[in-house]
């Protein structure tokens, strides 16, 4: 379910910025004209050029200022120079202005006033363009200004005079008709109002999607809670449990999933979970410490009516737990630690990364940042600058596209707790405004995110994405034992992250980029357990007792990473394949007389049905995405390998109802041939979805070839959570993830050119730490007992 969070209403959409400032754009244009090819660029200093090129640069800047195109014969090194047709890169997230235009265009296109009044806006996102459009933008209009991305002809590069207009994709729910529709809007003149004109958008298409329910919105959750709390039979049920103050009651609406025809998407439904706080004057009290059970409520969310209600069983409220709270001064008897000294991260010369709009350069990495209400953070166009080999692509698009949380208790209400937190709700639209010094440390660049609310207004989550560098311990080291001489390098990584809250749980999503060419995907899980109440003396084996009358059910968390790979592939090329590697033990015999032999065996995954695979730690199984036409210095194909971390498969039986919608959980790895529209493993609309195996499990039935293709990896990774007492009242972070690691991609370690640490002191000694500064032991009997 969605959570209430602070958002900032966007300023007037006509002035909302979309992309980099004019000065940055001018520096970029100058750099493009100066013919800086595929190398790393310094946008603060225009590279030196000869007189002819300087004149060309001046002409380009003048043209940019006047917005008139250059003459066709204006060129540098044979490349025609064109002005920007737009100030937003084709992959930049929609600006607040663009969202406003898209909403206004769709609303104006409603056939009748009733249709327009019933429109509710679930999602407004960028319709990502074809990869050829991205290649054009990256070649001549935006960083990295890599003209080699474009196909060549006998007459030179073909360069259109402008980029095509951006488009928005809207999911619209009509509250009056219970219909869901998808609209495509072309954003022609978004910022015209700033120049005294009008906003303009053009409807390209609109289609009603039958038999679906879109994600439930935060406004619907809030209205649902109010409806339930005002329902007289519900209030009577609360009084029977000794609850007279309804302000203490928390109603968390959950999507119903699909268990039977009663959950069909012909109705928009929610089944709430109910909790009760203890204190009316404590806004940060842990209200999840007292679940209210035995009450069954079914809400028609379309009409905001309770259509089924039953007080089935009187389960006593769990007692107030003195250890339930987690705010400062209220934990473990009200005593906080006093021996934590400040730790400062200082970068006196600033960060090593450079930014232009949503384009990032760091060390030898470059990529773009995107953001959607459903996925949250998206990483586009990942590439590595590899010396004389230039900018080498690795991936087109990386994101987390779904997560599923099934619970293992067969009793009501826990058996129906099977949340699809991305598809039923949205990871991005539940993202936090991050705080410096709390969520991220160091020199930080934040990115805001713009969303539509339920009624079509624009809201902005400030500081939604955090970009910063981190020290990550040792990168490599060797000491010559003969001479005693040593070389050591410290590892630094660039981290891009966001954090979201979905009801009681928090999820933090990270993409880490390393100096050795490695990419790590990480999820950190924290927040509060979803608890259940017990009868006096009751014990339930499907969870952990937190205190008498209160227990935490076992459950699993599954995440789906979608990775459209592009290892050494330019846009338009489909030269990747996937091999599975298993380490095998050699049979005893002539080849293994010492009985010590083992070797890595590779198997090419030739088609989609063959590429449904599971992790196997006993054979060190991993998978390599290789380019079929590029080799390293040994003649082997270049590649990147997916290295699994800790993982699991669903523990529910094969007939479990939630697996109807989550058939993709049956394997850890799926590989598909890229196809537009195949974006979410459970299909576009998993909420109340009655269709078995929609999405990934259906797409692979085509069994498309993978031997040389545009490859999409779907990696499903999960964790089985058997709760501990130490997970209460708020869970310490659990880590889960995987790594993309170069495998024959480079000719040697790309980390050998990292310079030595500037503060490396061969005469090591304590940092002025004396015996007197050691913290004295605390002899607090209360702390000792706790």
UniProtKB/Swiss-Prot annotation:
Active site residues per record: 421 (proton acceptor), 505 (schiff-base intermediate with substrate)
Subunit structure: Homodimer.
PTM field: Topaquinone (TPQ) is generated by copper-dependent autoxidation of a specific tyrosyl residue.
Chemical reaction(s) catalysed: a primary methyl amine + O2 + H2O = an aldehyde + H2O2 + NH4(+); N-methylputrescine + O2 + H2O = 4-methylaminobutanal + H2O2 + NH4(+)
Main function: Involved in putrescine catabolism in peroxisomes. May also be involved in the biosynthesis of pyridine alkaloid natural products, leading mainly to the production of anabasine, anatabine, nicotine and nornicotine, effective deterrents against herbivores with antiparasitic and pesticide properties (neurotoxins); nornicotine serves as the precursor in the synthesis of the carcinogen compound N'-nitrosonornicotine (NNN). Oxidizes preferentially non-N-methylated amines.
Enzyme Commission number(s): 1.4.3.-, 1.4.3.21
Protein's UniProt name: Diamine oxidase [copper-containing] 1, peroxisomal
Pathway connected to this protein: Alkaloid biosynthesis; nicotine biosynthesis; Amine and polyamine degradation; putrescine degradation
Organism: Nicotiana tabacum (Common tobacco)
Location within or outside the cell: Peroxisome
Record InterPro entries: Cu_amine_oxidase, Cu_amine_oxidase_C, Cu_amine_oxidase_C_sf, Cu_amine_oxidase_N-reg, Cu_amine_oxidase_N2, Cu_amine_oxidase_N3
Cofactors that this protein relies on: Cu cation; Zn(2+); L-topaquinone
Source superkingdom: Eukaryota
């Amino acid at each position: 379910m969605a959570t209430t969070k602070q958002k900032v209403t966007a300023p007037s959409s006509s002035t909302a910025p979309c992309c980099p400032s004019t000065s940055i754009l001018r520096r970029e244009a100058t750099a493009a004209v100066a013919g800086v090819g595929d190398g790393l660029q310094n946008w603060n200093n225009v590279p030196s050029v000869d007189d002819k090129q300087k004149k060309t640069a001046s002409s380009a800047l003048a043209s940019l200022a006047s917005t008139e195109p250059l003459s066709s014969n204006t060129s540098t090194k044979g490349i025609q120079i064109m002005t920007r047709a737009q100030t937003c890169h084709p992959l930049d997230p929609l600006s607040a202005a663009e969202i406003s235009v898209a909403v206004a265009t769709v609303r104006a296109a409603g056939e009748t006033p009733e249709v327009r009044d019933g429109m509710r806006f679930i999602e407004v996102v960028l319709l990502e363009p074809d990869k050829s459009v991205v290649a054009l933008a990256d070649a001549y209009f935006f960083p990295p200004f890599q003209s080699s991305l474009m196909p060549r002809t006998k007459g030179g590069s073909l360069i259109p005079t402008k980029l095509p207009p951006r488009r928005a994709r809207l999911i619209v729910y009509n509250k009056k008709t219970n219909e869901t529709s998808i609209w495509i809007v072309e954003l022609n003149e978004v910022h015209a109002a700033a120049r005294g004109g009008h906003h303009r958008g053009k409807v390209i298409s609109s289609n009603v999607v039958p038999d679906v329910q879109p994600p439930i919105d935060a406004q619907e959750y809030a209205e649902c809670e109010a409806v339930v709390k005002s329902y007289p039979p519900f209030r009577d049920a609360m009084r029977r449990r000794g609850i007279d103050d309804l302000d203490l009651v928390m109603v968390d609406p959950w999507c119903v999933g699909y268990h039977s025809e009663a959950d069909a998407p012909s109705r928009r439904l929610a089944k709430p979970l109910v909790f009760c706080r203890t204190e009316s004057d404590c806004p940060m009290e842990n209200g999840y410490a007292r679940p209210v059970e035995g009450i069954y409520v079914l809400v028609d969310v379309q009409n905001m009516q309770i259509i089924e209600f039953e007080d089935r069983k009187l389960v006593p409220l769990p007692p107030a737990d003195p250890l339930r709270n987690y705010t400062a001064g209220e934990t473990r008897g009200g005593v906080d630690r006093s021996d934590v000294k400040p730790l400062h991260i200082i970068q006196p010369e600033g960060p090593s990364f450079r930014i232009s709009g949503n384009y990032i350069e760091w060390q030898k990495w470059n990529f773009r940042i995107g953001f959607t209400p459903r996925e949250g953070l998206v990483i586009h166009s990942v590439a590595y600058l590899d010396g004389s080999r230039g900018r080498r692509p690795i991936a087109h698009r990386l994101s987390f596209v779904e997560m599923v949380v099934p619970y293992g208790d067969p009793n009501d209400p826990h058996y129906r707790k099977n949340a699809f937190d991305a598809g039923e709700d949205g990871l991005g639209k539940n993202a936090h405004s991050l705080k410096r010094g709390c969520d991220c440390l160091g020199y930080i660049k934040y990115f805001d995110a713009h969303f539509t609310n339920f009624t079509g207004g624009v809201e902005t989550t400030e500081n939604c994405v955090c970009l910063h560098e981190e020290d990550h311990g040792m990168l490599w080291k060797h000491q010559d034992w003969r001479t005693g001489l040593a070389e050591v390098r410290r590892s630094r990584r660039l981290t891009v992250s966001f954090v979201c809250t979905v009801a009681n749980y928090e999820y933090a999503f990270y993409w880490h980029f390393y100096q050795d060419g490695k990419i790590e995907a990480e999820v950190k899980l924290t927040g509060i357990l979803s608890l259940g109440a017990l009868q006096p003396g009751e014990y339930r084996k499907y969870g952990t007792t937190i205190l008498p009358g209160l227990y935490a059910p076992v459950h699993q968390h599954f995440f789906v990473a979608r990775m459209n790979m592009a290892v050494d592939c330019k846009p338009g090329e489909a030269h990747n394949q996937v091999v599975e590697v298993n380490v095998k033990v050699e049979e005893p015999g002539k080849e293994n007389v010492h009985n010590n032999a083992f070797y890595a065996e590779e198997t090419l995954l030739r088609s989609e049905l063959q590429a449904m695979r599971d992790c196997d730690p006993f054979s060190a199984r991993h998978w390599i995405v290789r380019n079929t036409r590029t080799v390293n210095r040994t003649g082997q194909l270049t590649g990147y390998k997916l290295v699994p971390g800790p993982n699991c498969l669903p523990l529910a039986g094969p007939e479990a109802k939630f697996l109807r919608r989550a058939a993709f959980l049956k394997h850890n790895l799926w590989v598909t041939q890229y196809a537009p529209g195949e974006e979410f493993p459970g299909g576009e609309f998993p909420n109340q979805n009655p269709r078995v195996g929609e999405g990934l499990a259906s797409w692979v039935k085509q069994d498309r070839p993978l031997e040389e293709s545009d490859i999409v990896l779907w990696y499903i990774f999960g964790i089985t959570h058997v709760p501990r007492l130490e997970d209460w009242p708020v869970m310490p972070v659990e880590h889960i993830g995987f790594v993309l690691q170069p495998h024959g991609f480079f000719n040697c370690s790309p980390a050998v050119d990292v310079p030595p640490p500037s503060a490396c002191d061969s005469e090591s000694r304590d940092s002025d730490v004396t015996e007197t500064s050691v913290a004295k032991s605390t002899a607090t009997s209360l702390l000792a007992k706790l």
